[in-house]
Amino acid sequence: MIKYIVQGGTKLSGSVTISGAKNAAVAILPATLLVSGPCRIENVPDISDVRLLLEILRDMGAEIRRYGRNTLEIDCTRARNATAPIELVRRIRASYYLIGAELGRFGHAHVAMPGGCNFGVRPIDQHIKGFEAMGAMVEQSGGYVCADAPKGGLRGGHVYLDIVSVGATMNILLAAVLCSGMTIIENCAKEPHIVDLANFLNAMGAQISGAGTDVIKVRGVKALHGGCYSIIPDQIEAGTYMAAAAAVGGDVLIENVIPKHLDCITAKLREIGADITEYDDAIRVESAYRLHRANVKTMPYPGFPTDMQPQITVCLATAVGTRLVTEGVYDTRFRYTAELGRMGANIQVEGKTAIIDGVQTLRGCEVRACDLRAGAAMVIAAMCAEGMTLIEDAHFIERGYEDIVGKLTALGAHIRRIETYETPSVSEDAG
């Protein structure tokens, strides 16, 4: 079990380097199953979700070498089509990318339903719709998804996604790259990590066009070859440190970013009063005064990201006035507001909207991280608060943030990590 102890009240100052994108890495690692030969992947974030996926790939027979903290060489040439251990798959939502990758490589996939964060109904019906459009037979039974390609292999198909789905867009890409013919995916998600996955696959010999637009076309190829690739910086990690600097106050230079990916976050933080300067590959955030009020609605990219919703809510919790945060992607993502309420925040949730009446200060107490991004929000709130805060279940935070304690400590925060070796209780949002 992992806990953080945070002493609030210290402004942040200095620079922080952003790691590789979690949401790209957790799709690119399963994608190596499609490649004949070694893939050297740089800027891989050292986070627990990545470590779990590497365990799964090793169990399937992948040869994996690590060079330093953030470079991997993965060779899945001799990988076998095996059912991944359920105790690993159930701990990570992104394990569903194994379905597309295994179906594309072996023509068969048998994968346990994934775990990860739980903030509403997140079915995989759009993934299945895409696989079936390529001729696969898909069944869900006993907590598993079983998919089989037709005799002769997957064939190109035309898929219109009923909702904009990041996971479905990426999973269908994985299944389509080695199939025969052309696959067209309409109403695609456009997030930077989708473009990064497509760029990785193209670097290995795939023929994908249109990633980052509404329509992606995949012309199937017979094989992919090994190569080198560097994962893009993490948009959400960068946004989290931007929000922390704005909420806590101070002067922080956030390095190794792609400012274009952060446009909507930058615009909203400027609207609430942060002073932001953009450079070619860095962003500086300065904040010296109490933040202003602003309404926020999460949307698919290029809108304000749902993965930044808890962090911006913390910014508004101590801002002047009353404002609304509306969740436009998931059914519910406000469980963490009860934890903020324990710290003195005044937040009322009505359906998919949180009504926030800003308070002067938060106070330290004992809270828990209910999921990855909510956990990051708890850390920001704890740094804003008067006194000491104990954050339970901090293992959620380490699913997606590399060395968050070390990075924040370097910025002047007073935060300590405590790990005990109890067996964590099993819960529906474990992972």
Predicted feature locations:
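Short, structured segments at the rim of ligand-binding sites
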Residues: M1-G431
